Amino acid sequence: VQEQIRITDKKTPVGVFEEAVKTANDSIRQCASETPEFAGMGTTMVAATVLDDVAYVVNIGDSRLYRMSEDLRQITVDHSLVEEMVQSGEIRKDEMRTHPNKNIITRALGTDETVRPDCFEIQVRQGDVLLLCSDGLTNMLEDSEMEEILRENKNDLEQAGRTLVERANEAGGKDNISVILVRL
């Protein structure tokens, strides 16, 4: 993203995100084409930048952004088969985390020549906390568990991050776990 801010003529946050996603997608695809053991690799992503009272968000795949204000709210929508099943009414939202197809994503960086990220903006307030995380966290903990951990550690985000990872690992920790917490 920082590279794109320097070189792009698209100076809006959304324009910068779109260019950064395109560049990352091209780089991953090139690496996969040059190194046989990387063939077919891809990744998910979520990123945000805040200007004044607006958070600009981009996501691809099932990495998520949450906002903790009065309560914890999922902001991004997963690009996954189970999310599509929820939207069509085939399963309930509370069944996503344990569904056998929970790891099938419908969009990722590096898997297709072009990628369509979701780019949007949300209003934020001073004191809000943003949680950016991978599915290694959200597949192991319910949103209510994450909210409880954030409330218990509201004055120590570093400890909150450690506790989120520890609890996800204790719950089975089947995937890598990435957590970023930012207080506005």
What are these regions (language model features)?
Residues 1-184:
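PP2C/PPM-type serine/threonine phosphatase catalytic domain
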